Amino acid sequence: MSAPTILIMAGGTGGHIMPGLAVAEVLRERGWRVLWLGNPDKMEGRLVPPRGIELVPLRFQGVRGRGAAALLKLPFLLARACAQAWRRLADIRPDVVLGMGGYVAFPGGVMAALRRTPLVVHEQNAVAGTANRWLARLARRVLSGFPGVLPRGEALGNPVRADLCALPEPAERYAGRSGALRVLVVGGSLGAHALNTTVPQALALLPEQARPQVVHQAGEQHLPALQQAYAQAGVQADCRAFIDDMADAMAQADLLICRAGAMTVSEVAAAGVAALFVPFPHAIDDHQTANARFLSDAQAAWLQPQASLTPQWLAQWLGQRTRQELQAVAGRARTHALPRAAAHIADVCEQAARRAS
């Protein structure tokens, strides 16, 4: 008897691809054959094949924000992508199709529905993306990382790394700590400039004895400018291009200052770390603010818009934080973790395939 087959559709950003890979790994451990529908010229082309997963090519990208000329081409591009997707599905004949977001998922999802192949959709963000808003109407099951995102949605969480979920409870990690607060700053690859400039300036406003210990990750491209910013501010910091062991970095931190992508927010909850979210202001539909509110509305994190993140505000805010308060916030964040999200999403895919057989 041949192994059941799933076709995962996700592309464009790591926020769609990485959770899809987590589900793929669970299903492969259960004996499934996993294929991936994506654009080989985009991020999925770099991330998926090294994991031993065959990338089934489909070249399609969104036109939102690309101007009138791109919008006029959309019907032709979509028709061509749908024809490609139909042929791919006819060749593969998957038992179930899982859409994790990104424009490439739209033609594949529509064609799966037309072929009566079970379609499962998972939305990572607290505001659904364009493709998933449409595909949710066609899907057998609709899943989400946060509550109340889509009609018929089941909030199963976002798949996160096991090493984050395995960290000790915040009370155990914070116990016995003394001295300066430990702050981890993660700028990310998008829009890191605001954090990279504001944090050094804010720390310079604090008395030297009141400054926290800082580890600041900014990406290789931004590292020289970040080091210069701290030097000009007269502030010592551990500046890094990358952090190889993010779980350990989070475990050591009293406070994380970061953006609010869906996976970041889910990882904060999984790790149980106090976080100040500064949402990327140009994210589509301002979805990062909605993501951050999942924790900030529960007093399990703080949210500060970038427009009002000044060095003066941040210096005053940091000066008011205590380790005891940060531990309490970290503990509340941990209560919102859904550590078995990948397994639960895989369960739903298996259920959808069985019901169709």
UniProtKB/Swiss-Prot annotation:
EC number(s) given by UniProt: 2.4.1.227
Membrane topology, from the record: Peripheral membrane protein
Top-rank taxon: Bacteria
GO MF terms, alphabetically ordered: UDP-N-acetyl-D-glucosamine:N-acetylmuramoyl-L-alanyl-D-glutamyl-meso-2,6-diaminopimelyl-D-alanyl-D-alanine-diphosphoundecaprenol 4-beta-N-acetylglucosaminlytransferase activity; undecaprenyldiphospho-muramoylpentapeptide beta-N-acetylglucosaminyltransferase activity
Function field: Cell wall formation. Catalyzes the transfer of a GlcNAc subunit on undecaprenyl-pyrophosphoryl-MurNAc-pentapeptide (lipid intermediate I) to form undecaprenyl-pyrophosphoryl-MurNAc-(pentapeptide)GlcNAc (lipid intermediate II).
Pfam families documented for this protein: Glyco_tran_28_C, Glyco_transf_28
This protein's UniProt keywords: Cell cycle, Cell division, Cell inner membrane, Cell membrane, Cell shape, Cell wall biogenesis/degradation, Glycosyltransferase, Membrane, Peptidoglycan synthesis, Transferase
Pathway in which this enzyme or protein is active: Cell wall biogenesis; peptidoglycan biosynthesis
Primary location class: membrane
Gene3D superfamilies the UniProt entry points to: Glycogen Phosphorylase B
Name of the molecule in the record: UDP-N-acetylglucosamine--N-acetylmuramyl-(pentapeptide) pyrophosphoryl-undecaprenol N-acetylglucosamine transferase
Catalysed reaction, written as an equation: di-trans,octa-cis-undecaprenyl diphospho-N-acetyl-alpha-D-muramoyl-L-alanyl-D-glutamyl-meso-2,6-diaminopimeloyl-D-alanyl-D-alanine + UDP-N-acetyl-alpha-D-glucosamine = di-trans,octa-cis-undecaprenyl diphospho-[N-acetyl-alpha-D-glucosaminyl-(1->4)]-N-acetyl-alpha-D-muramoyl-L-alanyl-D-glutamyl-meso-2,6-diaminopimeloyl-D-alanyl-D-alanine + UDP + H(+)
Entry's Gene Ontology cellular component terms: plasma membrane
Keyword Membrane set for record: yes
InterPro entries cross-referenced by the UniProt entry: GlcNAc_MurG, Glyco_trans_28_C, GlycoTrans_28_N
GO biological process, alphabetically ordered: carbohydrate metabolic process; cell division; cell wall organization; lipid glycosylation; peptidoglycan biosynthetic process; regulation of cell shape
Binding, UDP-N-acetyl-alpha-D-glucosamine: T13, G14, G15, N125, R161, S189, I243, Q288
Signal peptide span: none
Keyword Transferase: yes
Protein family according to the UniProt entry: Belongs to the glycosyltransferase 28 family. MurG subfamily.
